[in-house]
From Swiss-Prot:
SMART domains named among the record's database cross-references: RRM
Keyword Transmembrane: no
Cross-link (Glycyl lysine isopeptide (Lys-Gly) (interchain with G-Cter in SUMO2)): K36
Record-given protein name: Serine/arginine-rich splicing factor 9
Organism: Rattus norvegicus (Rat)
Residue ranges of the region described as Disordered: 187-221
Modified residues (Phosphotyrosine): Y214
Length: 221
């Protein structure tokens, strides 16, 4: 039995509502659906006879709840299309401002790194999951040419990412892997710039630094 006293909670406590679930859904199924977005603190499944099941999932980090909404709202699960949202209307009392349903969260920072060499199936959620090894990521975005951008809450986390996550193995949610490059945005002076691949264009921080090499389990290598 869950200890949640109020099912109406909000974005500040890391809780999300999951509706339109299949009738045979289990808590383990919900864990499998949402574990990639962050550490789950609690799952409460409401499966009452004659009613469409729904659930509440609480993440330890409220920002992971935001990611889960963007990643799973409208997701086709079996014969059902999931409805994933905060238990009440977004109130603006902390957390990320809401962007479009399929876009990244819009909280921004000046502690920014660029990433190249992402595999075609790499999403902004995958990029955030990989780069959060260096610290708290407040924004992540991915372009179609294998480029990405990540912003950290703290300067020291950004600097750690430049030192430790450059030339590391990245894996997408579809299993594609590649070795990515991580470097500072042009014009910054964080002491970690690299020149191995030549200069980047003045106007486009997403200009490629060379052809990425990636492996897909679904196509010949």
């Amino acid at each position: 039995m869950s200890g949640w006293a109020d099912e109406r909670g909000g974005e500040g406590d890391g809780r999300i509502y999951v509706g339109n679930l299949p009738t045979d859904v289990r808590e383990k199924d919900l864990e499998d659906l949402f574990y990639k977005y962050g550490r789950i603190r609690e799952i409460e499944l409401k499966n009452r006879h004659g009613l469409v099941p729904f659930a509440f999932v609480r993440f330890e980090d409220p920002r992971d709840a935001e990611d889960a909404i963007y990643g799973r709202n409208g997701y086709d699960y079996g014969q059902c299309r999931l409805r994933v949202e905060f238990p009440r209307a977004y109130g603006g009392r902390g957390g990320w401002p809401r962007a479009s349903r399929n876009g990244p969260p819009t909280r921004r920072s000046d502690f920014r790194v660029l990433v190249s060499g992402l595999p075609p199936s790499g999403s902004w959620q995958d990029l955030k999951d990989h780069m959060r090894e260096a610290g708290d990521v407040c924004y992540a975005d991915v372009q179609k040419d294998g480029m990405g951008m990540v912003e950290y809450l703290r300067k020291e986390d950004m600097e750690y990412a430049l030192r430790k996550l450059d030339d590391t193995k990245f894996r997408s949610h579809e299993g594609e892997t590649s070795y990515i490059r991580v470097y500072p945005e042009r014009g910054t002076s964080y002491g970690c710039s690299r020149s191995r691949s030549g200069s980047r264009g003045r106007d486009s921080p997403y200009q490629s630094r060379g052809s990425p090499h990636y492996f897909s389990p679904f196509r010949p290598y």
